[in-house]
Amino acid sequence: MTHELISRTGRVQNWMDNPEGRLPVSCTVYVVEDSMDEGRDSIENSWRFVSHALRYGAGVAVHLSKLRPKGSENGKGLTASGPVSFGKIYSTLNETLRRGGVYKNGACVLHLDINHPDILEFITTPRHELPWVKRCVNLTTEMWDDTSDALRESLLYGIKSGDIWLNKIKHDNNGKRIYGNVCLEVYLPSRGTCLLQHVNLGACDIREIPTAFYSGMSELCDLHGRTGVGESGEYLPPATDRQVGLGMLGLANLLRRYKVTYEEFGYALEKLNMDAIDTTLGEAKNIALQFKMGVDAAANVARSHNMDRAFAIAPTASCSYRSTDVDGYTATPEIAPPIGRKVDRDSGTFGVEPYDYGDVEIASEVGWDAYKKVADQIMIMLQNTGLLHGYSFNSWSDVVAYDNAFVEEWLASPQTSLYYSLQVMGDTQNKTNVYAALDESSVKDYLADILNTQPQPDCNCQE
């Protein structure tokens, strides 16, 4: 592990060490057109694209909303089988293909808009029928308002059970739709790709924060044109595909070192975003000021390289495990407080390894409101640059109530996604405990459905 100011993703570092059979981009998307074999973005070509992405180390999001609903006819005597039927093919591809021929931990996520006629089937399909893909529902406030109560109920249950993620529909500055990636922190055009890396806030002194942001963005922008991703013909070339994704990890470590709570930091960020600095906030104010200086410096670098989007807060578990803070403790993932101060990482690929975050504030001490204020205010700061992708925003299943009001509050917030539902009141961080929000009888029914199926892939942009 290292306490460097910049934490590279495994994909970038592995590509630098050995570019053979892999690419440094973390993610890509493919928008499937409603044709079996006609056109570059046909259904059949999507299979080749997904195969290419997984074999070269990129997680791939497949957007299926343009496909005709199940049972509809095309006027030529052909009847559509619907998006879910093709989802089973992508699941099998992900199960079978080894990323770069080394680790079997690729990621594939299927996306469908909430107003697609087959959305209920998409939400309620049993996990054993789609065991190697995750499912994400794309929506806007207007779409949610037009959604029936029955569909809302099914969607909320899917969120509680961990089977369904949410992503806001987003358009670029020219009004063209861009599409959520595997882990929901990046928005791309079809066949676009994104490089990711992270500022290790835990390795920074306060005055080093701007330098870390500047250096991290400079390295990403320099690497952007040298990846060779467009040479295969599958991905868009860097000359036209203009985005990178600089995120951050180790925030809890940084706050611990300067004895600042999440509540204090959130308040300082809020005041700064309103151009109202509170001089009584001490180190919380200083961290917030340096944080904004870093974001502004990184944004200027991205603009000088003509990037369309440049900030993305990814789920950095794997990357954080390889990074340490100034005092030698493991850097905490992304910007959220960890669930416990120590964690055993149980990975089917890498086995069980223990990690110690030090005496950081943990989620149960921070509280949902204080954490959400920090997350919202950071998103507002990044939004103000005009270069934001998004944030893989986890909810806390044993704290929040998954109901209409929760979704409506999320839609009105600066958050762009609703990712995993995590239990935070225990001491074990385990994203596989997807039934955390269910009652006992529901858990029994749920487990009966999945007990004998293959495990879900770890959908992590760094692994």
Predicted feature descriptions by range:
Residues 1-463:
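Long, C-terminal-biased catalytic regions of enzyme "large/alpha" subunits
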